[in-house]
């Protein structure tokens, strides 16, 4: 799935409603070097686990460095964006409450 407002970012649903998941959905993001996700907000929280690469989590709370093994919590209604600042793809897992449109 590609996302409006993103550059070099791809999202793939790993576990969703189609798998019978009623409470949470698990998504995988890959952001190319120099790429970013949309700068956006939504009414639900989500949790991030960084798998590979390096980047910056841009948010109202201030910019945070992202590296493999880091975890990040994004509060509901918080403006946020993930930027790849490294030389290899930035990959992370994102958990969101279900049901939600996978592009949100």
Question: What residues fall within each predicted segment?
Answer:
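Short beta-strand His + acidic residue motifs that chelate non-heme Fe in jelly-roll/DSBH
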Residues: 38-39, 57-58, 74, 80-87
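Short acidic-glycine-tyrosine-enriched beta hairpin
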Residues: 61-76
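A generic "binding-loop/recognition-motif" signal
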Residues: 35, 43-44, 62, 78-79, ...
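A short hydrophobic beta-strand segment most commonly corresponding to one strand
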Residues: 28, 47, 73, 87-103
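Conserved short histidine dyad/triad with adjacent acidic residue
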Residues: 11-12, 27-42, 76
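A short, N-terminal "cap"/entry segment at the start of jelly-roll beta-barrel domains
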Residues: 1-23, 103-104
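Short, charged/polar surface micro-motifs in flexible loops or helix N-caps
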Residues: 19-22, 32-35, 54, 98-101
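Short, conserved beta-strand element in jelly-roll/cupin
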Residues: 28-32, 41-59, 95
């Amino acid at each position: 799935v590609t996302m409006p407002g993103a550059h070099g970012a791809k999202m793939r649903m790993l576990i969703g409603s189609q798998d019978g998941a009623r409470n949470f959905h698990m998504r995988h993001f890959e952001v190319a070097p120099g790429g970013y996700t949309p700068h956006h907000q939504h009414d639900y929280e989500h949790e991030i686990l960084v798998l590979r690469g390096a980047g910056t989590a841009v948010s109202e709370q201030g910019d945070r460095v992202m590296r493999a093994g880091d975890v990040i919590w994004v509060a509901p209604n918080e403006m946020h964006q993930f930027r790849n600042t490294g030389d290899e793809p930035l990959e992370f897992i994102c958990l969101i409450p279900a049901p939600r449109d996978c592009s949100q």
